[in-house]
Structures are given as structure tokens and as C-alpha cells.
Amino acid sequence: MAASILNVLLRRLPGVSPFRGAYGVQVLLQTLCTKAPPEDDSLPQVPISPYKDEPWKYLDSEEYQNRYGSRPVWADYRRNHKGGIPPQRTRKMCIRGNKVAGNPCPICRDQKLHVDFRNVKLLEQFVCAHTGIIFHAPYTGVCMKQHKKLTQAIQKARDHGLLRYHIPQVEPRDLDFSTTHGAVSSTPPAPTLVSGDPWYPWYSWKQPPERELSRLRRLYQGRLREESGPPPELMPEVPLTAPAEASSTEPGAPQSAL
């Protein structure tokens, strides 16, 4: 009687189907389908920093002083690498999506640190106070992604005048470069022109040897006009007399009485 009533109730329930086991025991089966949780939801979410809009306030907070004190954020960081020689470059990035790598860099491990050109106190920790050179990534231990952000933020802070940097002082020179360098100065005159000699030595008059003169006399006997001394171009010029004076000095001209 009880079994018949149970069978009637099972027929009326759509989600429950009767199943008779091997030993005559009825087993109730009911399919319960639940949605599997997505893989991304299983990972812990990255906490949102309260200092995202104003990152410079975190460096003045008591929490920062208790954690870092007066030392830079990368002072106590030690890189985790294989072997005794560290790689030349740090990892590309520490956070990929919601996955955080083991032993993250000094900036990625603290979610309240934000690289911003207005966060001057943080940027000063990655710049040498004596030379103004930005520390290399293997020296500070930051990943290459954060190192690129730091370099861009430091340059932007310098452009806005928030971060001081060294400008080399160059003393002005009171020298006239038009006369100090040989390539731009006036060309000095040739030594031969200063002494009055001609530019080429064969332009100056030289008395030929006597042996050569005797040979020419024998060769051009009766047709050679004897000359001695420099050529006529270098001989002193005789002043020319006026035509009136020349006519008065003629022998047949009458002379005026005194």
C-alpha cells in the first residue's frame, strides 16, 4: 500500500525519476546543474589604492614611514635569480592582468606606490643626487615596465620644473675666432713679396755667365746688340719733356731777347 502511494507521487514529480537498484531498493536521481565559476573570478582581485589620484600623499603618511622610513623604496629589495651572477636586465613586467609574479619589484609589490610626474619624492629616489643620472634597472631592481614609466615621469617632471637637474656651466669666451684660427684668419703675404723679390725666382734678373755670353757672341756675330744690366722694364724711366719745351730747344729756333 505504501509502495503504491510512493510510485504515484514519483510520477507526479517531473524532476525526480524512480530507479530500481539491483537489490530492489529505489534510488531517487535528480540532476542539479550549477554554473561553474569562471577562472578569472577565482583569482584574487588587485586592491584599488586610495592614493591613485594623489600618489604624493602616500609618501607623507604614517604607513609609509613605518614601512620604509627614510630609506628609498628599493633599498631592502633583493632580486631572486638563478646562479650567482644576476641577469643584465630585470623582468619585463611583474603584473600580467591579475597574475602577480613571485618576488615583484619594489614598485609593483606596493600597490599604493604610483609613478607620476607630480610624485617628486618618489622620483628623487631613482635619480642620483650628485650627477642627476637615472639609476639603472638592475641597480634598483624595478622591472623594465616600471623603469620605462620612471624615465618618462622624470623627464616630464623636469620639463614642468618640478624636479631639479644639473645644467653644465659653460664660461663664455672673449676671443675673436675670426683671427685666432688659421683657417679663418687673413692669409699672410708671401715672404718673397715682403722682401720685394718676384714670386717666381726666374722672374728676377740674373747676369748670364760669361761663357754663355761668349758663345752667343760667336753664334750671332754681327747681329747681336750688346746690352748690360737689367732689362728695360726695370730701368729708371726718363721724364718726357713737353712739346713746347722740345720745340724751344731745337737748334734752328730763334731765342727771345732777355
UniProtKB/Swiss-Prot annotation:
Domain of life: Eukaryota
Protein name: Small ribosomal subunit protein mS40
Gene: MRPS18B
Family membership noted in the UniProt record: Belongs to the bacterial ribosomal protein bS18 family. Mitochondrion-specific ribosomal protein mS40 subfamily.
BP GO terms, sorted: mitochondrial translation
PANTHER family in the record: MITOCHONDRIAL RIBOSOMAL PROTEIN S18B (PTHR13329), SMALL RIBOSOMAL SUBUNIT PROTEIN MS40 (PTHR13329:SF2)
Transit peptide feature, positions: 1-35
Source organism per UniProt: Sus scrofa
Cellular component, GO, one term: mitochondrion
Ranges for region Disordered: 223-258
